[in-house]
């Protein structure tokens, strides 16, 4: 939702190009959370501890980069950290090699392969927001909802839940597509046997739904 909001209003990544309202939302595919993690032996325990540290915010232009930057800008820490902009796999390797101190990424919904795989060799910890930090971010960015990431048994080193936020990932279509075409597309995707095949390829498809509540306050449109 973050990139679609920026495109709809011509801000952030889309400031140079201006508003683009030629798309419509057709389905809610899944919810993601935002993960901020460190090596388990790191002295970093809180977001305040990240001042002066090397924090990877993922590749510029990616959706996860926007969400990572929103965290540190929203908490007033962006000018107090040393940002890096490595991709998913490279950032996992960099954390393991201690080239970066902090790893930030989207979770689908609560893990990301690069971090989970690293934890097998070098245990990691998710950094929890304080309740005040969580409220500060979800109040500033209305498209985020408070979410607690439960302990993930596949992530070695994670022993406590972590306060974070969640946000929806939508399926879009051009506004010029006919209602009939959209209906047929969704009908085929949502047919139980087809949905099962999609979910076997990417598990998040099993959560395909019609929850568009997060669009209301920003007056963004669902097809048609």
Where are these regions (language model features)?
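Short helices/loops that flank or line small-molecule/ion binding pockets
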Residues: 1, 70, 89-103, 116-121
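Beta->alpha turn/N-cap motifs
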Residues: 1-13, 87-88, 104-112, 129-131, ...
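Short, glycine-/small- and polar/acidic-enriched structural segments
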Residues: 1-59, 126
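Ligand-binding "clamshell"
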Residues: 8-25, 113-131, 137-156
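An extracytoplasmic/periplasmic, membrane-proximal ligand-sensing/linker region
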Residues: 90, 107-126, 136-142, 168, ...
């Amino acid at each position: 939702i973050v990139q679609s909001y920026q495109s709809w209003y011509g801000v952030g990544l889309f400031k140079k190009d201006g508003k683009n309202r030629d798309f419509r939302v057709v389905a809610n595919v899944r919810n993601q959370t935002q993960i901020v993690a460190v090596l388990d032996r790191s002295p970093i325990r809180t977001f305040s501890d990240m001042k002066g540290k090397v924090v990877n915010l993922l590749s510029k232009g990616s959706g996860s980069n926007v969400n990572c930057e929103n965290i540190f800008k929203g908490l007033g820490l962006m000018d107090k950290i040393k940002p890096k902009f490595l991709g998913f796999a490279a950032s996992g390797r960099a954390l393991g090699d201690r080239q970066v101190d902090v790893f930030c990424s989207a979770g689908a919904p609560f893990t990301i392969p690069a971090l989970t795989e690293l934890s097998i060799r070098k245990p990691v910890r998710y950094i929890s927001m304080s309740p005040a930090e969580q409220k500060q971010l979800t109040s500033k960015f209305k498209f985020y909802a408070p979410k607690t990431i439960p302990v993930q048994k596949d992530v070695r080193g994670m022993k406590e839940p972590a306060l974070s936020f969640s946000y929806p990932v939508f399926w879009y279509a051009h506004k010029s597509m006919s209602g009939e075409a959209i209906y047929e597309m969704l009908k085929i995707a949502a047919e139980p046997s087809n949905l099962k095949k999609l979910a076997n390829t990417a598990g998040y498809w099993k959560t395909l739904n019609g929850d568009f509540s997060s669009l209301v306050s920003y007056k963004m449109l669902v097809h048609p």
